[in-house]
Amino acid sequence: LMQKGSSGAALLAIDGTVIGIHVGKFGVSIVAQTLPNSTKWSDILYAKKVEDYVKKRTDIFVPISKMENQSESIFSLNLSHYPKELQDRLTDFTVYDDHEYSKKYLDGLNAVKIGNIPQVKFRPRGTLVVDGELVELCENNAIEDGEYGITVGNLDVIYKDARKYATPQREDYDEELLIKAIKFVRKQFSFLYGTPFVPPEIVLRRIRRQTSPGGLWTLLCSTKGQVIEKYAPMLYKYMKDILEGKPIPTIMVSSAWKEELRLLEKILDGKVRTMVPVPIEVVCSFQMVFGNMMDIISNHDFRITKMAVGFSPYFGGWDALEHSFDGFDKYVETDISKYDSHVRNNIKTLMFNHFWSTFFVTPYEETIAWNVYSSLYHVQFLLPDGNVLYFPDGGRWSGEPLTACENSLINYVLFVYACHKQGFSDEYILNDTQCIFMGDDARCGFRRETTFSFDSWMDAYEQCGFPVGETQKKFLERFDVSFCSLKTLPRQYLGRYVFVPIDTKMLSSLR
């Protein structure tokens, strides 16, 4: 059954499940999820059952007797895994260009200034573009917040954003209690045990339709598909070398501003976001090791995983998400500022040791997984002016394949950690709370007259190095609470109430 909702979005009813589908310029989206362009409903609604997916690993790779760890210096420029035309084009690091922006935002902080690659410099553009057509489009879609503009970054924005990775943060958490929280979350994901690696040739098929190739590849190609067309054998060899236990070359990530539609008042306040895309070889290695796990999580029932990553319509989408909060009396929401930059290496190590590593069947697989996982601990951070930095504490880079999954998992862990710190049992967490996480966003419901302290939860974030800032600090009514900036609107459809998101804030769908 297909018909239009009042917003113009298609409402598709299958076996009593109602799903809102928005078709925009850049593809098809279900609620907040963007899927690749497609004309087949079977592709849009594709989801696999994973209950029977857990199977014993068949070892198709030759075991390696001795594993080597990454040993290259962060202060050298290794281009051995890049094409010869790029190697000939670039020289090694020269003296770091310590200009006004670098001194203003990085001096005295935990950032090592490595050097400069003059060949990657490009001229910064302006700071603000107001597009009249987009303003009109917003007005036509009943967005009443005023004028909008397209954000365009500059060096000031870039260095200000880099500063967050160099800022020391509070870390006085109870490690034993945090590990206990990770193990609690791990139990909910036992279905991941025995998940096999993805063969290299399948990896290249999966990522072919993705966009920026990241890192130094942007000097040669504009999309991952172009890199694969020209240099697939190099990428294939890169993955096979990893499977043979060879050291992973030092990785270079590149910082760039993100052009997007934002409220004019936010742009004028300097709220312009940046991205740090990882190079295509990193996407390949992580997809090879963790790709199947990420697929399983994305297609699993979010009432078990507590994660809206992928948000498979197989489990009912937004309507089912809202119904999962039926019977709860108090609600809270969080949205942690600059979340990615505060996911430091020590937290990631705990996550690998007590979560990811437990799902690999053989020591060989676990070692390969650790080599890939830790390859992003010590990266070279390339800025648009050619300067290269190193942040000893690490961080989360926006283009990491694991970002959505692991950030959501860490958010879940921090909630459980806060519950344990307040003396709540595992049974209380399972039976008297309901949560949903998507990256840094969280929405939680509590049953009955709970004594759960929101301030204590926020202090748990602070202890683990996540500054809370202006996060909401009180209980809310059911339809006042939001998730990923979306609030819920109950609507009648075919004689019953259907919960849909109020999507006037979903500006990305307008472009």
Predicted ranges, named:
Residues 2-23:
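Catalytic nucleophile loop of clan PA
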Residues 19-20, 30-34:
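Active-site scaffold segments
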Residues 26-27:
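A short acidic/small-residue loop/turn micro-motif
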Residues 35-511:
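Viral RNA-dependent RNA polymerase
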